[in-house]
Design a protein with these regions (language model features):
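Alpha-helical elements of the RecA-like P-loop NTPase motor core of helicases
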Residues: 17, 43-44, 101
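A short, well-structured beta->alpha microelement
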Residues: 24-66
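Walker A (P-loop) phosphate-binding motif
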Residues: 119-130
């Protein structure tokens, strides 16, 4: 079965690194996780059609050109909550400076249709004493 492709794109390493770690902790090798931190590379990467299941991008990187891509779930990390240039687009908005756990949980809960059963978190072995 093909792994879902998740692209995290933000020039702010302080946001993208903990989010990347969270995805790796929960889903290990069940997803194809790609990280983009450079604006020029982001534009070049999406200049041709890509097979991406979930895109999480900073609002500075997001443009209406991304609607031409076949991306089932798009999330825009915004600094403020409220209407802005992405409010009329197909992307879900997430406040960038909320907790990483909150950002991650929102992405996962709104993307369950994309990942189906392959999106179950990695279960670590636990020892229980009675």
């Amino acid at each position: 079965m093909k792994k879902p492709v998740v692209v995290l794109a933000d020039t702010d390493i302080k946001i993208i690194t903990p989010l990347e770690l969270r995805f790796l902790e929960e889903y290990d090798d069940k997803i194809d996780l790609q990280i983009i931190t450079d604006r020029e590379y982001f534009d070049e990467y999406f200049s041709t059609p890509k097979n991406v299941d979930v895109l999480v991008a900073d609002e500075a990187l997001y443009s209406s050109e991304l609607q031409k891509q076949n991306i089932p779930k798009m999330f825009v990390l915004t600094e403020e909550v409220g209407p802005d240039k992405t409010s009329d687009l197909i992307a879900e908005r997430i406040q960038k400076y909320s907790s990483i756990k909150e950002i991650f949980n929102r992405i996962v809960s709104l993307s369950s249709s994309v990942f189906g059963s392959s999106f179950d978190p990695v279960k670590n072995t636990q020892v229980l004493l009675f």
